């Protein structure tokens, strides 16, 4: 199996130029599915901290870069929405956030903010012992004793303790950002949630400073004011 794929075939979310070199790295197994960007692409093409895969491998072998507070074993580890990248030697920290057009970008944050990660609850299941398991947008999950969360909610998880430190409900009036579709990167408040019959996708109407927009409910993630303030810095 090849470790490269043609640049013209990569997902639109990848922050790479499609008309330069023919091939780019292929994301390995891991979170975020097909939308995940290989870590080496972020280090080489976005941040320009390394020149090649060998330098990227050295960086992860020496814990020069951490993802969500953890060491990384594979330069092709997929990086995706809301992941936290930390560069301890540089004292630099970034959150992965979609820009206008849906491509993944990096927002610089401080060390305190880098200690936790925002997760969208896609659904929940009951596991052994009657515990509730929250399933998140990146494929990760968290088992809890309490059942206080719903699909569409967002939770902030401490990367050291794996405990939920904040909870934002998916409801009218909630602050959201669109992470896909033509409004990706836009931020506003949910004005209306429209539940569609059958298999049709639910939609939301969002009010923002540009007059608002309507999009598929799956495309929005609930955030809070602190999140916006950090991204504006």
Curated annotation (Swiss-Prot):
GO molecular function: RNA binding; rRNA binding; structural constituent of ribosome
Record carries keyword Glycosyltransferase: no
HAMAP family assigned: Ribosomal_eS4
GO cellular component terms listed in the entry, alphabetical order: cytosolic small ribosomal subunit
Native species: Halobacterium salinarum (strain ATCC 700922 / JCM 11081 / NRC-1) (Halobacterium halobium)
GO process annotations (BP): translation
Protein keywords: Ribonucleoprotein, Ribosomal protein, RNA-binding, rRNA-binding
Domain S4 RNA-binding: 37-99
Pfam families for this protein: Ribosomal_S4e, RS4NT
Protein name: Small ribosomal subunit protein eS4
Record NCBIfam families: PRK04313.1
Domain of life from the UniProt record: Archaea
Protein's gene: rps4e
Family stated for the protein in its record: Belongs to the eukaryotic ribosomal protein eS4 family.
